[in-house]
A protein has these predicted regions:
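Small-residue-enriched transmembrane helix starts and helix-helix packing motifs
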Residues: 7-36, 57, 116-132, 150-163
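Juxtamembrane transmembrane-helix termini in multi-pass membrane transport proteins
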Residues: 21-83, 87, 142-158
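Alpha-helical transmembrane segments and their lipid-water interface positions
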Residues: 40, 66-78, 100-103, 137, ...
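Core segments of transmembrane alpha-helices
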Residues: 67-70, 129-141, 195
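Selective transmembrane alpha-helices of multi-pass membrane proteins
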Residues: 83-112, 165-169, 181-208
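Flexible interhelical linker loops that connect adjacent transmembrane helices
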Residues: 110-125, 178-183
Length: 208
């Protein structure tokens, strides 16, 4: 990647006042943020590791719905409010951290209670985790150029990217589960620990 593009990407991601209007940088930023490990991707991978790719495909719709609602809500309605009242952003981080901790407990319990092949990650769980995912703020404030007439096309490209990257996480989870063999049910347990870690990082950023 040319150094100029690296600089532009870093500038846009660090400054919410500079949403991306260059299609190349837009796709690069979206794919980079989506591919980064986080709560949603952790749930997708752990669900696929236990239930398989086909049974986990509905989770992609949950992820897509969660991201689109979150991004549109922030991009069209909450941008001025978040800029004027930073305390709201802090409160949102605390809520996200608490929910991820709750999700970690639920995932750990369901893993122990579920029978072989039964899904341990639910549609609702992925939807809410994605709706509250801090990545949504990054997309809405720093990447998607809200306010421009072509924003519907950016949202379409964003939605397609969500499904594509999410599917790759399902594949990755399935491969991890296949490699783990009979120990595949440990994958959601590991994922629950990861969710606790994400919750801690988000809580720390809220009070830092």
């Amino acid at each position: 990647m040319p150094s100029r593009h690296v600089f532009q990407l870093g500038t846009a991601l660090s400054d919410p006042r500079t949403p991306m209007t260059n299609a190349y940088l837009f796709l690069l930023a979206v794919l980079t943020v989506l591919a980064t490990p986080g709560p949603t991707n952790t749930l997708l991978a752990s669900g696929s590791a236990v239930a398989g790719i086909r049974a986990s495909l509905p989770l992609l719709l949950a992820e897509l719905a969660g991201y689109l609602i979150a991004v549109d809500l922030v991009g069209f309605l909450l941008r001025p409010l978040l800029a004027a009242q930073p305390v709201i952003g802090t409160a949102l981080k605390i809520v996200v951290a608490l929910y991820l901790a709750y999700m970690a407990i639920q995932l750990w319990r369901r893993t122990g209670q579920a029978t072989s092949g039964q899904a341990v990650v639910t549609w609702r769980g992925v939807f809410i985790a994605t709706l509250l995912n801090p990545k949504g703020l990054i997309f809405a404030l720093a990447i998607i150029p809200f306010g421009r007439p072509e924003v519907p096309f950016y949202l379409l490209a964003f939605g397609l990217s969500v499904v594509a990257v999410g599917f790759l996480w399902l594949v990755a989870g399935h491969l991890i589960g296949a490699a783990a063999g009979e120990r595949r049910r440990l994958v959601p347990r590991i994922a629950s620990v990861a969710l606790v870690g994400f919750a801690g990082l988000i809580a720390a950023s809220a009070f830092g």
